[in-house]
């Protein structure tokens, strides 16, 4: 640990807020803090509760704690807000007015209840309860209501979880915040970690003001800042800090590069004539990097000073809206470059996923690995949807099924033979949770889905006014909305380790018509000296690209 990480990890009890900028070792600091408390201060592991926002983050936390503490790490409760809420409801089902064997409603059940109830939420809940079901979105609000009405339960859980750790605290919403306030007294041992400049989820109800008022909510709260960045090169960090400066929520915002590399490349900036030109630029540059065939091959020396070639899995293309992915994906496909694409949408909303989940539930008696069963379900369903019958009016196509199989397979492998775990991850996870980090493919992600990930090479495409910041026709974004878009831009820039390219086009088809575009105003905040202008003298694409890549 570095000096400030050590200060954070070994802080005494009481409320603690850790402001951890991108790439500053947030998870490492959090796990070392928990390990320090258990190993050095004799805190019982069963008194610790660590809450994350995604299952992927929870798994990573659990895995690292096992590495630090060994078998006793199993006694620490690590989970998402949803899974903690579910635990509280399972343990107090009767008090909460639920049957002991209540289930989370699947998509079909939710859709049926919604169709019958219309917009009447009370009727919708009543229909679910009649079938012993709970909506996924109630997994936090129901425990909050339960604890509010039963002070003795509040005491019981405060006694059980005397030490609470919350990751990504800038993303909590009003209900999650209330749950934390119920579980942790104002002078309690609550450790919150995050970065308000990465608060990008207001559309989901997240409210960064809870992070900003931590010291008012909790008595004598300590504040520790982590500013040493282990991820990105100095030019990338300089650009990112300048980009966020106009609306930063962190006083004296800084990110100090731990990597000292005087030869680190500047941020590549490509002004494209069209969307096709932009996609060709991405393909051409990937070809140069992966083939290592030109002076532009990535020789920033990835720490050890040797020229290193890049593989497809080292590369990500990020964009503001999912619609921007198609031309990039098509251009990569034409060049035979493998791709995996993910968004921040819920897994269960992807066409085909619900059908596969239903098939697995019905075929519950079958054994075998989840991955094999997903593939089998895919074959059965693809055939069923290929022959139109009266009951296949769902609009799901065989292509949807195979796309869903591709997206779900990495997740299925991680679940081994545990179908129940797989189904619950489908219910609560986002598409990006099913990303396969080992896949030898270029990753295409929305900026929201990219949060928390890192790649040696990043392309941030579509840096135009109207896309970044996003503006829908006929609307004027508020100051707060523009500030959040700037934070999203900051998140995108700080995903890059060695190489960062930003691009913008002169003309783009948006909302059904071709429009003139101007570069994003966010680029203006970055010193021109940090950019390398590309494209003014870019070599034309060699004709033999396909052969070289094969």
Give the ranges of each region predicted by the language model.
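P-loop NTPase Walker
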Residues: 1-98, 131, 155, 238-241, ...
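Conserved helicase NTPase motor core
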Residues: 1-10, 14-22, 28-30, 49-50, ...
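Helicase P-loop NTPase motor core
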Residues: 24-30, 34, 220-222, 229-337, ...
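Short, polar/flexible loop-turn hinges at active-site or ligand-entry regions and domain interfaces
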Residues: 42-47, 67-76, 92-106, 126-132, ...
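Short glycine-/polar-rich loops that comprise or flank the Walker A/P-loop
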Residues: 43-47, 74-75, 186-189, 195-197, ...
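Conserved beta-strand -> loop -> alpha-helix junction used to position metal-binding or nucleic-acid-contacting
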Residues: 73-88, 337-359
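Conserved helicase C-terminal RecA-like lobe
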Residues: 311, 325-333, 350-530
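Acidic, low-complexity intrinsically disordered tails
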Residues: 532-550
